[in-house]
Amino acid sequence: MAVFVDLNLTNCTTVKKLQSVIEMAAHLGYSAVAINHIAEFEKKKPEIVKPISTKDLFASPPTVQGKSTPIQILKRLTVIASDPSHFNVLRSTSPVTRLYDIVAVYPKTEKLFHAACTAIDVDIICINVTEKYPFFFRRPPVNAAIERGIFFELIYTPAIKDSTLRRYTISNALSLMEICKGKNIIISSGAEKPLELRGPYDVATLGLLFGLSERSAKAALSTNCRAALLHGETRKTAFGITHTVKKPQTLEDEGEAAEPASKKAKKE
């Protein structure tokens, strides 16, 4: 049985509102959700807040529909980047990113999109679905992101709110599919209210309109999401990796190494 995941629930203004969205996700059959904390540096006082804890939301998380296990609640950071300096917080040495299970970036220009695909240490690149894309997707950066294990995210909430936004969502999704061929795609809700959520199989059907095959549409809600989470774990683990260095030889060791094998045998 597939394990469905929604990696983008908007961090609501009130705890009660967020609780109701998570409860609806569990009722619809999602096994895990990520609360999305957005950092927008264009604001006068940009701030990356500490992610909300599961304990602050539920004493006991709601049980997933059709299963006996509670829903898993993850933490996600999305940085809206309109300038190269906004990527500084995404460095692997940044203590901020280690607080989150998933780190995403929303690049506003083609140059920033290229940098996110080829050089920036993130798990997800967000695709704008609310307006006509300001540039064309190109194969080299998209392929580079796929090779690095980075995923591209499409959100479906705008498509169910407004007919104009639906056209932009489908158009931008199809443009991306022409380049990536359905690889490394994630579909999330971006929901702020319970009624904006849709069941996993309904979302997979919507994925067909985005140009995905039936198999790829299902993967965009399940296996690809788990792969993105694994990428996030690896990113955090890599921060603490230590390098092993060959022990330097002492003069005595060097002397022994220089002796012929026959001479060593006589000594023994």
Residue ranges and their predicted role:
Residues 69-106, 110:
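Hydrophobic alpha-helical segments and helix pairs
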Residues 1-35, 41-68, 94-98, 111-268:
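Charged catalytic cores and adjacent phosphate/nucleic-acid-binding surfaces used
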